[in-house]
């Protein structure tokens, strides 16, 4: 729980620090993003923490976020690895911790990282 609070505090501080930036969302469905979240989505997508769904052209704000997507966001914020270059190193942790995750799944490294860090 303490780690989760640190992660959320870091994310909030990051968003608040960069809140002066004004850039447009790169997502095709940005009109569906609630105005009160638009700035945060813009900043986090510019930082490559949010990468969109499927081919990355949509944000899908009305779609339920999955455990895999949350794990990817947490991984990118905590590690700073927005290029996901080391995420695969944690894939084996996911397979041993969760019966519904295979080491070959696109999200296995993120789930593995969060599991190993005691976040999920």
What do the predicted segments below correspond to?
Residues 2-39, 46, 50-109, 116-120:
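Feature responds to low-complexity, polar/acidic, surface-exposed segments characteristic
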């Amino acid at each position: 729980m303490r780690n989760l609070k640190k992660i959320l505090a870091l994310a909030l501080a990051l968003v608040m620090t960069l809140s002066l930036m004004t850039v447009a969302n790169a997502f095709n469905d940005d009109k569906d993003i609630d105005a009160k979240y638009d700035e945060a989505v813009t900043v986090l997508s510019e930082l490559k923490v949010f990468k969109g769904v499927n081919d990355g052209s949509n944000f899908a704000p009305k779609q339920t976020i999955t455990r895999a997507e949350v794990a990817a966001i947490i991984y990118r914020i905590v590690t700073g690895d927005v290029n996901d270059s080391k995420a695969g190193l944690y894939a084996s942790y996911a397979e041993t911790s969760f019966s519904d995750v295979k080491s070959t799944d696109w999200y296995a490294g993120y789930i593995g990282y969060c599991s190993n860090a005691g976040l999920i």
